[in-house]
Curated annotation (Swiss-Prot):
Pfam families: MazE_antitoxin, SpoVT_C. One of its GO terms (molecular function) is identical protein binding. It comes from Bacillus subtilis (strain 168). Induction: Expression is regulated by the sporulation transcription factor sigma G. Homotetramer. Two monomers dimerize via their N-terminal swapped-hairpin domains. These dimers further associate into tetramers through helical interactions between their C-terminal GAF-like domains. SUPFAM superfamilies: AbrB/MazE/MraZ-like. The N-terminal domain binds DNA non-specifically and the C-terminal GAF-like domain is crucial to its correct folding and function. The non-specific DNA-binding activity of the N-terminal domain is modulated by the C-terminal domain, which perhaps in combination with another unknown factor, confers activity and specificity. Disruption phenotype: Deletion of the gene leads to aberrantly formed spores. Mutant spores release their dipicolinic acid (DPA) via germinant receptor (GR)-dependent germination more rapidly than wild-type spores. Spores are also more sensitive to UV radiation and outgrow slowly. PROSITE patterns: SPOVT_ABRB (PS51740). This is Stage V sporulation protein T. Residues 5-51 form the SpoVT-AbrB domain. To B.subtilis AbrB and Abh.
Length: 178
């Protein structure tokens, strides 16, 4: 029998403590939802739950529609990674970790318009030269579950793009609440 992982006991309330190192590595924060699966071999599997990933195809279509109408690149992310990309290279963004700047914007629950950005991190650890960007957090039932990002490397954005990102975030939030 191979021994991998860490052994933990279940307390009298049925709780299991997930070690801090694992939580940090997987970016599991206090209050984050986890899915519990049981496979055929009797193994219990914990998976980080992303409510917005249920909207994966829908988010992709919405990103495509925004790109078609505005002509700027569009990204949609959950709390950890980008789940939809339109107008930019998918290999540069899709399933890549979001930056700390994006996490902070989601935690503040308010949209941002930066019209004279220089160097910005959208993907964790990768600086990009940008002219402007706007971010709208997707807040469902009071909790930030993702964000919509519209950015341009050569054009300046204004209130139209800012309102579009807020509208998209609000619409996706309402879809999640239903």
């Amino acid at each position: 029998m191979k021994a991998t992982g860490i052994v933990r006991r279940i307390d009298d309330l049925g709780r299991v403590v997930i070690p801090k190192e694992i939580r940090r590595t997987l970016r599991i924060r206090e209050g984050d939802p986890l899915e519990i699966f049981v496979d055929r071999d009797g193994e219990v599997i914990l998976k980080k739950y992303s409510p917005i990933s249920e909207l994966g195809d829908f988010a992709k279509e919405y990103a495509d529609a925004l790109y078609d109408s505005l002509g700027h690149s569009v990204l949609i992310c959950d709390r950890d990674v980008y789940i939809a990309v339109s107008g930019s290279s998918k290999k540069d963004y899709l399933n890549k970790s979001i930056s700390e700047m994006l996490e902070r914007t989601m935690d503040q629950r308010s949209s941002v318009l930066e019209s004279d950005a220089k160097s910005v991190q959208l993907v964790n650890g990768i600086d990009e030269d940008m002219n402007s960007y706007t971010v709208g957090p997707i807040v469902a039932n009071g909790d930030p579950i993702g964000a919509v990002v519209i950015f341009s490397k050569d054009q300046t954005m204004g209130e139209v793009e800012h309102k579009a990102v807020e509208t998209a975030a609000g619409f996706l939030a309402r879809q999640m609440e239903q």
